[in-house]
């Protein structure tokens, strides 16, 4: 039996087909006559321009992956393949906002290679900066016997962040929790921290090892808000390697406020450190207040 020409049927009379394979043929008119093209070739040509435009966003490097917010759940543990991708600096299938849920805490990707090429000892290790969605617990910057806010001398920023009880002891619980969740993969790197205060301003600092530390205003907001600045005569010791906003907070600002007040490490006055208020605004508070501990750390 001879085949019936397609031209004897209307398009609406043809059998519907929704699962074409690469070898399927599509009739196409090039302006001179009717020809054929495979589905594979048609598809490739149709997306050619789009693929060229989005390709840079899919490159396997920190710059490309810092530019995309995804927010995908990555499960309850970092896989061997994921650690390998971090180590290689390709960050395959890892994007800003992705998170692991470990011990009831969402640990969310905030940046890729944020500290690379910084520090008095150069950071050359590829890494991912992680920030928990919630505060791990509450603690004071300066401890009191009551465990809560007290007036007067209890509120001091003497010694800066390095001299605070938060730095010296109150972060230990967070370090234990985080090192258990990411065993053997918490990166030790070098950052510059305040260790002296004069007239309510940071007046000195030093390079320190960092594994788990409070964030600073620049990491959260993209700039200083309450931190004292140069007035033309006095220049506060605001030296830091964290000069830019974490991509997590840049792409999704709602991640800054978690409906709790949590500490930042910046010295604001002789008695107050910076914090993020429960209502979402930038704030500062007396050192003896017990506020949330929401630290940042790197895995590699």
Predicted regions and their residues:
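Extracellular repetitive beta-rich solenoid segments
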Residues: 2-49
